[in-house]
A protein has these predicted regions:
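Conserved signature/switch motifs of ABC ATPase nucleotide-binding domains
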Residues: 148-151, 168-169
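ABC ATPase NBD coupling module
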Residues: 73-97, 121, 240-244
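Helix-to-loop junction immediately C-terminal to a conserved catalytic motif
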Residues: 56
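Conserved ABC ATPase "signature" region
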Residues: 72-75, 116, 120, 127-144
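A short, surface-exposed alpha-helical micro-motif characterized by mixed small hydrophobic
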Residues: 216-218
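The feature captures the beta-strand-to-loop junction immediately N-terminal to the Walker
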Residues: 41-43
Length: 360
């Protein structure tokens, strides 16, 4: 059984704003397992930051239960409220590192002093603190920049220092709240790859809050989509990308734009006669499970012709995932058998109604 490191149950966070109740987080439950890189995505104001601030009780919930590494930090029921004692919460918080969009480094201190600062509370000798800080800088690829000042570093390098500092107390969990939002594309990719490496090498569990689906696509294994204080859809990265149900998810993952492009092509496509012997299919598949021989096979075995209207390939973590919109022409029975064949070969098949083409 995978070990649950974060268990949020029925969390609500309500704020009072000008006499009105703002439901920033509304009855959200979320479990994160050891070694996950759990992407929490949604537009600004969806409640992502508020939800993750609950994990280490930087934000106290209005209702719900917070368990980290098996220990209950907070539980509020109708009858009572239980909160972990302050002296126990402090070390618990150290199990959870955080990085943000703003790096929050101390400008007047050198890079290594910034990292050492996070180790000061430990009963370590000066020398040990310096050695540990140096080790952390090496881990994030900045072993030779310890004597520089933050202003002398690029944004990406400053975020690396912030990551080294967040790891100073050997946390099991790292919360990344929009950590790449202020970075250019190159630095964004480098920071995401660093998080992926730390996840792999240190078995660090990462909660990745972002409004950028590309970030999630690159490193997350699981995704929760938030809208108006609630999780509207969740699943493995592959599920969310190949089988999104909620309109916002479709928009975020690009299914909506793929579908719009395919429909625009179909409207002007003479191969599509809108006849009773034709189906429009939306296929998604992993790796290279669909290739030329498949269309040949469908023709030979089921007497259906498959013509590709639109295709796109995304890379999820390291796996290519393809999207195809095809017109399948042939007898109803043959088309049904061909669809069964595709499904049996790990292809997700969705029939697109003809209305979609007419009304789009
Ligand atoms: N301390 C607070 N007091 C009052 N309202 C708050 C407070 N913190 C957050 N909110 C409100 O709660 C809602 C959710 O905010 P939150 O920051 O969690 O969203 P988000 O999805 O992280 O978006 P962003 O990326 O813009 O921060 C917003 O409407 C915000 O204005």
């Amino acid at each position: 059984m995978p070990e649950k490191v974060i268990e949020l149950s029925h969390i609500s966070v309500f704020f009072n704003q000008d006499g009105q109740t703002l439901k920033a987080v509304n009855d959200v439950s979320l479990d994160v397992e050891k070694g996950d890189i759990y992407g929490v995505v949604g537009y600004s104001g969806a409640g992502k930051s508020t939800l993750v601030r609950v994990i280490n009780l930087l934000q106290r919930p209005t209702a719900g239960k917070v368990v980290v590494n098996g220990e209950t930090l907070f539980e509020k029921t109708d009858q009572s409220t239980a909160i972990i004692e302050a002296k126990k919460l402090r070390p618990k918080r150290r199990e959870i590192g955080m990085i943000f969009q703003h790096f929050n480094l101390l400008d007047e201190k050198t890079v290594i002093q910034n990292v050492e600062f996070a180790l000061k509370h430990r009963k370590l000798k000066e020398k040990q603190i310096t050695a540990k800080a140096q080790e952390l800088l090496e881990l994030v690829g900045l072993g030779d920049r310890g004597q520089a000042y933050p202003a002398q570093l690029s944004g990406g390098q400053q975020q690396r220092v912030a990551i080294a500092r967040a790891l100073a107390n050997d946390p099991e969990i790292l919360i990344s709240d929009e950590a790449t939002s202020a970075l250019d594309p190159k630095n964004t990719v480098q920071i995401l790859e660093l998080l992926k490496r730390l996840n792999r090498e240190l078995n660090l569990t990462v909660v990745l809050i972002t409004h950028e689906m590309d970030a999630v696509k690159r490193i997350a294994n699981k995704v929760a989509v938030m809208s108006e204080g609630q999780i509207v859809e969740r699943g493995t990265l592959l599920d969310i990308f190949t089988n999104a149900q909620f309109p916002l998810t479709k928009k975020l993952v690009g299914t909506e734009s793929d579908s719009q492009k395919a429909m625009a092509i179909l409207k002007n496509d003479h191969a599509f006669d809108n006849q009773a012997d034709q189906s429009i299919l939306h296929l998604t598949y992993r790796g290279s499970s669909i290739s030329e021989p498949v269309t040949t096979k469908l023709y030979e075995d089921f007497s259906v012709e498959t013509s590709i209207v639109y295709g796109n390939v995304d890379v999820l973590r390291d796996t290519p995932v393809g999207t195809l919109f095809v017109i399948m022409t042939g007898a109803k029975n043959g088309r049904q058998q061909a669809i069964q064949y595709l499904k049996a070969h790990d292809v997700t098949v969705t029939e697109v109604g003809l209305e979609a083409v007419k009304n789009d």
